[in-house]
Design a protein with these regions (language model features):
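Structural motif corresponding to alpha-helix initiation and N-cap regions
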Residues: 3, 16-20, 55-58
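A short acidic, Gly/Pro-enriched loop at the edge of an enzyme's catalytic core
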Residues: 1-8
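Core SAM-dependent methyltransferase catalytic element
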Residues: 76-107
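Conserved beta-strand signature within the Rossmann-like core of class I S-adenosyl-L-methionine
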Residues: 30-43
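Redox-cofactor binding/interface segments in oxidoreductases and associated redox assembly factors
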Residues: 10-12
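Short glycine-/acidic-enriched loop or helix-start segments at secondary-structure transitions
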Residues: 20-22, 44-45, 83, 101-102
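Short alpha-helix
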Residues: 52-68, 72-73
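A short, conserved alpha-helix within the catalytic core of class I
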Residues: 14-28
Length: 107
């Protein structure tokens, strides 16, 4: 993935911290990152994900994109439905202008 960029990067219910900076770098100029996964506090709600290695720390997604992407929306919430869960969600966009030369075309 290093060196490749995409107009959209979407991650749900997955956290592998060594990849986080690469995910931000993979957002093409004018592109968007949408990320949602479990957060600290989930372990107290009876959720399956309880290992701190797989739970976002408070504000971790905000820290990740700071200085790289513009935050469009962010939540650090406890959901009640369908099952109680602590999650963080972020939608952030590249502030660079989108241009067609940034699109990768595959043969």
């Amino acid at each position: 993935m290093p060196g490749r960029t995409f107009g959209g990067v979407v991650v749900t219910n997955y956290l592998h911290r060594p990849l986080l900076e690469d995910l931000v770098a993979a957002v093409a100029p004018g592109g968007v990152l949408i990320y949602e996964t479990f957060a600290e506090g989930n372990e107290t709600l009876g959720g399956r994900v309880t290992n701190p290695d797989f739970l976002l720390r408070h504000g971790e997604l905000l820290d990740l994109v700071r200085g790289h992407l513009r935050v469009v929306a962010y939540e650090d919430v406890v959901l009640g439905e369908p099952k109680p869960a602590a999650v963080q969600r972020i939608c952030a966009e590249s502030v660079s202008e989108w241009r067609s030369e940034h699109v990768q075309h595959r043969p």
